[in-house]
Amino acid sequence: MENTRASLMFKTLAVAAIGLSATFVMLVRDPSDTLFGGGYPELWRRTGLAGAPTRAAACIFAGVFLLAMGWLYRLLFAPLELLRGVDEVGYIAEDGRSRAQAANEVRRRRKTGELPPVYPNGWYRVLDSHMLERGDVKSVTVLGQQVAVFRGQDGKAYVVDAYCPHLGANLAVGGRVVGGCIECPFHGWQFRGVDGRCVKIPYADKVPEFAKVRCWPSCEINGLVLVWFHCDGLEPSWRVPEQSQITRGEWVYRGRTEHFINAHIEEIPENAADIAHLAHLHTPGIVSGVDLRYTNSKTWEFIRHDWKVEWKPEPEPNKHCSQMLVKHALTVFGRHWPLLDLDVLARQVGPGVVFLLFEHSFLGRGVIMHCVTPVEPLLQCVSHTIFYQSSIPPLVPKFILRAECIQFERDVMIWNNKTYISKPMLVKEDSAIQKHRRWFSQFYSENSPRLRYQHDTLDF
Ligand code: FES
Ligand SMILES: [Fe+2]
């Protein structure tokens, strides 16, 4: 609603600007006008060039004005979309190597260590709801598998295996939504989203019972399309809770970021229990950037973030959840700015979803949905989607998301280049890490897939 109003205002301003510029250009006919107060040279008059410089200047001015308006509109109203490529963050590309070369080298050379299983049981995000319109089909890789995500004409989102069981065409590449079904682009078989059953074979009299595509248990909540994975095919044993402010439309979408991380999935949530790293990695002000070679530079020393953190698992019946309570304070030139104190509750629900709930006296309330989805055994897609009180100017949540993204990218540089240590050398103050590992182990079961070879990954 608010976005529609803003966009209407912008369109009105743009039309007014174009109208004014056009009028101005048309009015510039007289050679004795603006630029040449004393009249044009005779030659210009004869060749018909009189008035042209002013008209050109007016056109350039109108163009620049429109560009500036567009930029201002995006800054003030449009959601922040920060989508990082697989090799874009956290690698050091030196000696003339490209970022992709640096990333591939790190992946090839890395010692993976003794890893836990690579795909824990749980709910994982496949897409944000707004990315899937009615009738859309998207191809997504989750947990090493290709899936087709589509939204039926009934408005429901469905997730099925991408490869058609008939002859293997990819349903997400050229497939078409027909009612609540997806139609294969190769021979036109139609599969129902609800249960994967084939309901139509255009050239056959009868559809055999066994004609079926695998259908993933899925749900749509808090603006996310999620799938359930269990290595033994068991049904979901818990649900991702609803954030009612999102459903009621009180908190609205203000942007998202996406990163690909070259690490085992468990490294990412373990960060919440690694309390000591906050005081080291995340203390330098966000102005000092994300490249860990420079974040401790003297130039930005005057601005520091202070963190007080506590991590604990939740008791039954929510033992699949854990909580990190964060108290953030900002100091500038050693002076604490209480107005910028921020409390965050990070509630992890299963291995793949975290609710980062913000509460601030005047900056308002909102949530960042932090989702980790394994793409391959050692490649995680991490998305942060922010929903914020609709009454707060979008610039505020966009700034929060951007700031969070800077801190997160520092972790990315660590994760992308580290190895997993199954028996780490810990001190007493690191005890939450072991607790976290015990808590996280509930998402593995005997048949959870393991990494077979160190190079069980693809090059970027
Ligand atoms: S491969 Fe899909 S219908 Fe033939
Ligand atoms: Fe961190």
Curated annotation (Swiss-Prot):
Residues 123-227 form the Rieske domain. PANTHER family: CHOLESTEROL 7-DESATURASE NVD (PTHR21266:SF32), IRON-SULFUR DOMAIN CONTAINING PROTEIN (PTHR21266). The keyword Transmembrane helix applies. This is Cholesterol 7-desaturase nvd. GO terms for cellular component: cytoplasm; membrane. It is found in: Membrane. The keyword Iron applies. The gene is nvd. [2Fe-2S] cluster binds at residues 164, 166, 184, 187. Pathway: Steroid hormone biosynthesis; dafachronic acid biosynthesis. Pfam families: KshA_C (PF19298), Rieske (PF00355). It catalyses: cholesterol + NADPH + O2 + H(+) = 7-dehydrocholesterol + NADP(+) + 2 H2O; cholesterol + NADH + O2 + H(+) = 7-dehydrocholesterol + NAD(+) + 2 H2O. It is an enzyme of class 1 (oxidoreductase). PROSITE patterns: RIESKE.
